[in-house]
Amino acid sequence: SEIRDKFNKKIFGKKVLLIGVSYREDTNDTRYSPAEGVFDFFKKMKCKTSFYDPIVNYWDFTDSYSIEKKDLDNFDVYVYLIKHQSFKKLNIPYKKKSLILDLNHVLERNKRLRISNSKNYKST
């Protein structure tokens, strides 16, 4: 995978947050969600992976609950997966060395530019 090849050393064993795990935006349906494959990828990389989704409280694929909004600032890698409307107003205080991966163009242009200036942002 492109992510593994480019960021292997940066992500191995890190704390990862998947942002948006439903199958489609603005729904709580997680059946056939692409987030499952992403979760499995980070599991193979020995990462401690959590998720945040204001619409999906419980994700049966991982048998876990979404973290709370107040706990978004404690991760090494942030992976944006689904473009929920509520994410337009989401402001995460990223750590200086955090890696931000936007796999579905979730972040709006002005946020992408602000984050990309920190040199830790990757959009695919």
Locate the predicted segments by residue.
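Structural/interface elements that position substrates and couple domains in central-metabolism enzymes
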Residues: 1-124
